[in-house]
């Protein structure tokens, strides 16, 4: 009887028999949910294609612009650049010189301003070309030696005296002012301008001085009043159109020592820019 109990007891473990659980259906569990049976207890490992590593995500435009470095311009020299050393104060003058001159002038070097053709041409044009408007305007400004004369045109070799000071009218762009201090021992005028810059053509000889005053100009005491009065010419002017405002009369008698010093009556050098033949009178022709 005991053997029958052992065979029928479900928890009895026989040394020659395995433990048997109640058989269950594969799609059934305790909750009643059905699952698809898995083919293997663990999922298979993923394999990466050998060409997958070359595929990269393209960067965004914002990150591309920030990461890109600025490209510098490429300078290609057709000629070897020349290095010129100069001072900062001379930089602008050097730039104007290099940009305003031709290549042939640059090869000549710096030079001075007088050797440049443009400068010499402008100087010659200023000195040699006369103006179209040639007018003589005379204005008496008070008495004494205040005598104003405005002249425009090429030089005529005459001068004006203001209190023993001579102003030469030789050109519209050049003038020489001389006083008794810069006149040499032999009556030569020491001019500060070069001779070529103020050279003037030779002038015709002046007219002879007016005749002396008649004896009636002397009073009983022997004083010559004619020396202090203007002497009018006895001949008519060469051009009647010039006889206006003040006429063709001299300003005063130049024999009076009040106007000239003794060394001013001496001969002037021909190398002077004034071109005077003499200072015996002051007259317009």
UniProtKB/Swiss-Prot annotation:
Record's compositionally biased regions (Basic residues)? 11-23
Give the start-end ranges of region Disordered: 1-68, 195-218
Motif VQ covers 91-100
Q: Could you tell me the keywords of this UniProt record?
A: Nucleus, Plant defense
Taken from the UniProt entry, a GO cellular component term is: nucleus
What is the protein name for this chain? VQ motif-containing protein 20
Report the locations given in the UniProt record. Answer: Nucleus
Provide the gene name from the record: VQ20
Q: Which GO terms describe its biological process?
A: defense response; regulation of pollen tube growth
Instruction: Name the residue ranges with Basic and acidic residues bias.
Output: 1-10
């Amino acid at each position: 009887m005991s053997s029958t109990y052992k065979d029928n007891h479900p928890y009895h473990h026989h040394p020659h028999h395995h433990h048997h659980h109640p058989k269950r259906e594969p799609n059934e569990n305790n909750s009643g949910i059905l699952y698809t049976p898995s083919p293997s207890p663990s999922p298979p490992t993923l394999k990466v294609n050998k060409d997958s590593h070359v595929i990269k995500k393209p960067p965004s435009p914002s990150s591309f612009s920030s990461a890109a470095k600025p490209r510098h311009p490429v300078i290609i020299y057709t000629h070897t650049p020349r290095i010129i050393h100069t001072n900062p104060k001379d930089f602008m003058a050097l730039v104007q010189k290099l940009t305003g001159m031709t290549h042939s002038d640059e090869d000549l070097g710096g030079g001075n301003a007088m050797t440049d053709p443009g400068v010499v041409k402008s100087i010659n044009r200023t000195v040699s070309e006369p103006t179209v408007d040639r007018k003589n305007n005379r204005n008496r400004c008070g008495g004494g030696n205040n005598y104003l004369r405005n002249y425009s045109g090429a030089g005529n070799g005459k001068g004006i005296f203001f209190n023993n000071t001579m102003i030469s009218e030789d050109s519209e762009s050049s003038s020489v002012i001389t006083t008794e201090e810069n006149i040499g021992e032999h009556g030569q005028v020491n001019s500060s301008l070069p001779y070529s810059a103020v050279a003037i053509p030779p002038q015709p000889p002046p007219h002879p001085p007016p005749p002396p005053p008649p004896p009636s100009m002397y009073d009983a005491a022997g004083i010559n009043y004619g020396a202090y009065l203007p002497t009018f010419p006895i001949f008519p002017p060469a051009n009647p159109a010039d006889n206006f405002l003040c006429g063709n009369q001299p300003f005063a008698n130049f024999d009076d020592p009040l106007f000239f010093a003794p060394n001013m009556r001496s001969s002037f050098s021909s190398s002077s820019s004034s071109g005077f033949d003499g200072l015996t009178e002051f007259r317009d022709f």
